Amino acid sequence: MFYKLRRAGSALSKMGAVDFATTIAPGLRDVLLTGKACEVVKRKEKKQDNAYDFVILDAPPTGRIARFLNVNSEVSGLAKVGPIKSHADSVMSVIASEQTTIHLVTLLEEMPVQETLDGVTELEQAGLPVGGIFVNMTRPPQLNAQQRALALTGQLPAAEIETQIARSGLAPSRQLVDVLLAEASDHAERVDLEVNELQRLTEQELPLFVLPLLPGGIDLGALYELATIMTAHGIGEGQ
């Protein structure tokens, strides 16, 4: 936690000054916490035995990502010189360098997408290296565009649906047909929303890494499935 602060960090901890300082200056905690991640990154430069090929830091929510990573601005009003300023400079030498890539993760919903777009703008304004956008939990369309239009306007052929139910070996009923029509309408509305939000993200001209919704949840097999998709996107090749 106190990488580059050395004895000053130990003294601050013993005095309880860290908790006090981070209470009145919350940004200082971010400055202190990022130090360890940067120390791990620098192990590779020093060719240490405990170095890693890649270091992944799960940052705070998108709405405060720029403030969390732009540590120099966080300490500018607190310290112009001294160990805290030196620590911030050391952290920024890693975060703002070419060896760092900041990816954002979003869902295809209005608020998360807007937060992501705002986050990209804030990161770029801070001069921080934006990578790509991971689009999580996407749903493959079960209906084509024409069918979705009919579903949204309640014009799907109920009689044909009832016939298909009977062919599947189930007992057709008006109640079951109505349930399926309602689900089709909800699905069409959701797909149209995702299409529109994906278009907004595409306009950023950043790499998009689209990952599917896995209804069965996450287990080892699901992790391998997602890893295969990300590898196909080129993740892991310097990204």
Task: Identify what each model region corresponds to.
Residues M1-I56, T62-F68, S73-M92:
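Nucleotide-state-sensitive switch-loop elements of NTP-binding domains
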Residues A59-P60, T138:
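Conserved Walker B
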Residues L78, T106-L107, A184-S185:
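Short, contiguous strand/loop micro-motifs
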